[in-house]
């Protein structure tokens, strides 16, 4: 599918989000459902923000090859290349299933933990892909168009920048400005990390499943520590570009270096930790 990149860039700049229809192929959608069926129903949410009736599977990129291709999708890469610096990173990769009876999530923005003034140049760009169709009844994402343009003063009126989410009073006020992002299964919403949104209330009798890949500037700390989270034997099989997105890369001049060498060397089967090797060479003993 050929993407009208300029159209989607303009939509993100104006409204804070855009939707790519038919993002997943039929084969990708079927494989995604197959893989997620193995993991879901075993990862209950831990708090009201995650959702006590919401299931989340983190580090999705490590769990099946289908997610490698989706993370690297050329249409998403084109948008990231426009809004983010070269060497941008994958910051989060997770599945989200909102089960029947789940309450609406608190309003929030995905990168509120970067304590930088608003409005601001893009620090992160998020995607959410519908595995099940998003409807008003089953928990479609609620979003506030153009809220990525709000300054800190406007955010402070209804939204807690300090905590990254609104309280019940703030959520009630924001709800009047929000719209539901209904979209068919296989569609992808791409949005600014500062867009205020939330997972919707599931009033249906069926779960609503989605997954979210998020990308960030190369100088920003990633939400997920993929270097530790993705087994090295899995990471070593990934395409070089995906390895770079996980953090096996260097942002000039030397952000991300591994003991003064390139971190991708750690994926080689014969890799020896340089600190260990240097200590052995000089007869030094490392801390125990």
Where do the model's predicted regions map?
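Double-stranded beta-helix
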Residues: 134-200
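Non-heme Fe(II)-dependent double-stranded beta-helix
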Residues: 1-15, 20-118
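Non-heme Fe(II)/2-oxoglutarate
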Residues: 195-196, 200-288
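Short, conserved beta-strand element in jelly-roll/cupin
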Residues: 117-136, 182-185, 190, 214-217
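A short secondary-structure junction signal
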Residues: 103, 107-110, 117-118, 137-143, ...
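Active-site region of the double-stranded beta-helix
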Residues: 86, 100, 113-121, 130-140, ...
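Short, solvent-exposed loop/turn segments at secondary-structure junctions
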Residues: 25-26, 96-98, 112, 134-136, ...
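Short, surface-exposed loop/helix-turn segments at secondary-structure junctions
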Residues: 53, 107-112, 158-175, 207, ...
């Amino acid at each position: 599918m050929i993407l009208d990149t300029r159209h989607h860039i303009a939509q993100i700049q104006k409204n804070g989000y855009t939707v790519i229809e038919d993002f997943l192929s039929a084969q990708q959608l079927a494989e995604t459902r197959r893989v997620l069926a193995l993991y879901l129903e075993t990862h209950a949410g831990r708090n009201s923000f995650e959702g006590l009736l919401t299931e989340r599977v983190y580090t999705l990129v490590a769990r099946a090859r289908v997610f490698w291709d989706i993370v690297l999708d050329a249409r998403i890469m084109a948008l990231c290349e426009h809004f983010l610096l070269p060497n941008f990173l994958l910051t989060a990769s997770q599945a989200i299933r909102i089960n029947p009876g789940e309450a609406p999530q608190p309003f929030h923005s995905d990168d509120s933990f970067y304590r930088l003034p608003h409005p601001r140049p893009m620090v992160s760009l998020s995607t959410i892909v519908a595995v099940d169709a998003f409807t008003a009844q089953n928990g479609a994402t609620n979003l506030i168009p153009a809220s990525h343009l709000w300054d800190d003063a406007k955010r402070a009126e209804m939204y807690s920048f300090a905590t990254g989410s609104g309280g019940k009073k703030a959520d009630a006020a924001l709800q009047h400005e929000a719209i539901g992002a209904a979209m068919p299964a296989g569609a992808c919403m791409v949005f600014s990390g500062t867009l205020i949104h939330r997972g919707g209330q599931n009033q249906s009798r069926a779960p609503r499943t989605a997954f979210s890949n998020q990308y960030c500037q190369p100088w920003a700390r990633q939400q997920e520590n993929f270097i530790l989270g993705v087994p090295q034997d899995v990471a070593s099989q990934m395409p070089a570009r995906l390895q770079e997105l996980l953090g096996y890369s260097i942002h000039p001049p030397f952000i991300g270096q591994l003991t003064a060498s390139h971190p991708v060397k750690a994926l080689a089967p014969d890799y020896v930790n340089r600190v260990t090797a240097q200590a052995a060479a000089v007869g030094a003993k490392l801390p125990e």
